Amino acid sequence: MKGLTLSTLSLLVCAGLSAQPNYDYSTIQREKLGRGVVCIRDNDSVTISWRYLSTDKANTAFNIYSNGKRLNPSPLVSSTFFRYPAKDKTTKYSVVPVIDGKETKEGKADYTLFKESSKPYISIPLNRPADVQIDSRMCQYSANDASVGDVDGDGEYEIILKWDCMGHDNSHEGVTGNVLIDCYKLNGKQLWRIDLGRNIRAGAHYTQFMVFDFDGDGKAELMMKTADGTKDGKGNYIGDKDANYVTNGYINKSIDGKMEPHKRYVSGRILSGAEYLTVFDGETGKALKTVDYIPSRGNIAAWGDNYGNRVDRFLACVAYLDGKHPSAVFCRGYYTRTVIAAWDWDGKELTSRWVFDSEKTDSINRITNPNALPYSGQGNHNLRVGDVDGDGCDEITYGSMAINNDGTGLYTIGMGHGDALHLMAFYPDSTSLQLWDVHENKRDGSDFRDARTGRIIFQIKSDIDVGRGMAADIDPTNPGLEMWSSSQRGYFDVNGNHHNTSTFIPQNSAVWWDGDKLRELLDRETITKFNWNTSRCEILKNFRDEGCAFNNSSKMNPCLSADIIGDWREEVIVRTRDSKELRVYTTTIPTPYRFHSFMEDIPYKISVATENVGYNQPPEPGFYFGITNNE
């Protein structure tokens, strides 16, 4: 555990946790977060919540003021949550740190709750794009996936929001509207809009956008795939603004090198033309640097088919590959060939760190071992990042395989493609990370494995496509986390024991919402809590009843869920059904616990950055967080 600062360890110890990844927090590049104060009206009271930071001393307490009047009789030490009876009037609330009995201005923060702010969420009015005509019919834009980053260096997060219009899955033909990317402050101010242009198709697998402070200047950048005709936040075009590579017509269809007897309609796909990778200024949306996307399409059929399905399967992530600085990683392909390219941005130049090509790796491995398991065809619709081998640098888990921080293969288990992937410490006393992975091949089902070696701890085989899987601590009567999938009712504990339930447990996402250390379930526009006594899920929050909607069809995910403001628990960012408003919901349920912000944990922060990628997965920390045996 060398390199972990005392304040970082205090988070792990106070939560009954153990350290897994071996980051050197004294040298690693990290963002500087502010206090994150948020005030929400809840019936006849106001809930005030704020961050406990790793820079706070362990004995830091807090006082709360309302228009200069102290509200708490004694300094608050057990949590960073406070509720106070209040009327509907404009009020300035202040959170003031107290150290050794004395108030300090350092770390003090204010929040003005206006009289008209009478709803239990932060409301952000959206600049919904105008309807567009596609194939002779009018189509509406819908707010979709989001990410967060401190783009202006004030210590608080802004929201980067993607807009889709008539988005399509890669397997479906059809013209789409242009993909748009907006940036909003939490006070509702829109900072910019980027238009990716007609040569970037709309859909869950095309635009994976990374928001992170890559160059360490204290402000987050935005990095994503672009094309000729992309217009940045300043109105400047990338490449040829008049280029049009959108296909229209039929081709002779081939899959896995075999020609099919019928033609394939490919209207709306982008099968040719320049492909770029661009880094944008997070505060202005200005394009700072554009390079050729690695890898290029090349021979489209070499990716598994010739009609644009497999060639345009993209993933992306952020990883501390050198243990100190965040790199952007952009990927292409997972059904057959996979190419993963790591990039570094220093504020001036975007340089390639390394490129992993599964075909080249497989060819080399088979020279010495003809039966070597392949790295090709192992990717999921998502990926996970963390220091799985304890060297202080991040590795990338790409479905059924893992890539070392130097761009070489770490291991492959050869179980192929899947739809869900979870990387955490599953055991209360664990000194390593584990993975829960589900597979589509109607053979391998689900596997629970060691994240460093790929060693299978246990496997639940299945003769169906296991399309969903989740892992979280939902039952305090079992040691460690629980895991489950769409293949059967019930859940498994870390020892592989099956616990049956009468119904399926929600499988898409999870959120820390109420006051305990168990995790709640986030799926189908509701937050539910698993009742281990009745083996049923009980609704805590129904966003649908409040006029909100989740995204991406069966994926049913909010725009984002993450710990972005307030205490250690997570917020849920959702759109209204008409996409005219974005709402940031934060819990108003009291908690007796005080933990540091999850965003100060490197794996958690990275998983928030990658949450918008492919099939959205919930953010997960790099340490055990849950009920321990002594509770």
Protein language model annotation of sequence segments:
Residues 40-44, 322:
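Short, ordered beta-strand-loop transition motifs
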Residues 53-67:
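Solvent-exposed loop/turn segments flanking beta-strands in beta-repeat/beta-sandwich domains
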